[in-house]
Amino acid sequence: MIVGVGVDVVDVPRFRAQLERTPALRARLFTEDERDLPLRSLAARFAAKEAIAKAMGAPPGMMWHHCWIPRPDHGDGRPTVHLTGTVQAQAEALGITHWHLSLSHDGDVATAYVVAERRAAEEESA
């Protein structure tokens, strides 16, 4: 069952300006493993984090670095969502068991689309 859907679009030059204007922002938004990625990849990951928040109803108190979008390390190249802390607690409270994520960037725009899903126990074993 779909619990929520989220989408976000980031203007890459504007995002760059925000990171340059507020150096501490990079550490607040991204995990240590994400921080050294190219700017367009960071913008897409920020869009993903915004989309994840929207899929969960934009709960207050979410810590952005509690959501990690690593580089795909499996053969199909699909991005994955890893949660800890405040974001994981909210996902668990909503019964979210699976995330479907699509990232894209082209020119000055980065975008992310996410579907939050709750699967029944019998679906898990299938």
Curated annotation (Swiss-Prot):
InterPro entries: 4-PPantetheinyl_Trfase_dom, 4-PPantetheinyl_Trfase_dom_sf, ACPS, Ppantetheine-prot_Trfase_dom
Binding positions (Mg(2+)): 8, 50
Pfam family, one: ACPS
The protein's name: Holo-[acyl-carrier-protein] synthase
Record-listed E.C. numbers: 2.7.8.7
Molecular function terms from GO: holo-[acyl-carrier-protein] synthase activity; magnesium ion binding
Predominant location category: cytoplasm
Catalytic activity: apo-[ACP] + CoA = holo-[ACP] + adenosine 3',5'-bisphosphate + H(+)
GO cellular component, one term: cytoplasm
Location in or out of the cell: Cytoplasm
Necessary cofactors: Mg(2+)
Family in the record: Belongs to the P-Pant transferase superfamily. AcpS family.
One GO term of the biological process aspect: fatty acid biosynthetic process
Known function: Transfers the 4'-phosphopantetheine moiety from coenzyme A to a Ser of acyl-carrier-protein.
Keywords: Cytoplasm, Fatty acid biosynthesis, Fatty acid metabolism, Lipid biosynthesis, Lipid metabolism, Magnesium, Metal-binding, Transferase
